[in-house]
């Protein structure tokens, strides 16, 4: 476990600062399986999780939904047969906040015990 998966999200307002380049370089090392994607001019963190079937993929999606609700920070989720794509970014600041890295780490923790992972 790392410090990120033990942390909790803080309220993120529209005027909250995005992570700096230095923070980005440090934080991304703590979530090595995630990719930075640029969409609509802003950075997002994305990872694809593979499962044996749709039932397991849906259960994982619901588990991520539970932690998202608990933290008040919500990802993009695409659930397909045997696959879930999870995308974290801070909508209010149109970019990456420390909260997104926390939620990536928390997602990784859920994935470790998710049934039906490939």
Curated annotation (Swiss-Prot):
Pfam families tied to this protein: Pterin_4a (PF01329)
InterPro entries tied to this protein: PCD_sf, Pterin-4-alpha-carb_dehyd, Pterin_deHydtase
Keywords: Lyase
Catalysed transformations (reactions): (4aS,6R)-4a-hydroxy-L-erythro-5,6,7,8-tetrahydrobiopterin = (6R)-L-erythro-6,7-dihydrobiopterin + H2O
Enzyme class: lyase
CDD domains on file: PCD_DCoH_subfamily_a
A molecular function (GO) term: 4-alpha-hydroxytetrahydrobiopterin dehydratase activity
Bridged cysteine pairs (disulfide): none
One GO term (biological process): tetrahydrobiopterin biosynthetic process
Coiled coil: none
EC nos: 4.2.1.96
Gene3D superfamilies listed in its UniProt record: Transcriptional coactivator/pterin dehydratase
Family the entry assigns: Belongs to the pterin-4-alpha-carbinolamine dehydratase family.
Name of this chain's protein: Putative pterin-4-alpha-carbinolamine dehydratase
Species in which this protein is naturally found: Pseudomonas entomophila (strain L48)
Lineage of source species: Bacteria, Pseudomonadati, Pseudomonadota, Gammaproteobacteria, Pseudomonadales
């Amino acid at each position: 476990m790392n410090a990120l998966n033990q942390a909790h999200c803080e309220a993120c307002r529209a005027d909250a600062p995005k992570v700096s380049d230095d923070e980005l370089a440090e934080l991304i090392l703590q979530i090595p399986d995630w990719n930075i994607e640029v969409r609509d001019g802003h950075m997002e963190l994305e990872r694809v999780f593979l499962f044996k079937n749709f039932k397991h993929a849906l259960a994982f999606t619901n588990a991520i939904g539970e932690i998202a609700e608990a933290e008040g920070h919500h990802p993009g989720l695409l659930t397909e047969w045997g696959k879930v794509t999870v995308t974290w970014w801070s909508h209010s600041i149109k970019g990456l906040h420390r909260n997104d890295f926390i939620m990536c780490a928390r997602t990784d923790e859920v994935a470790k015990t998710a049934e039906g992972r490939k």
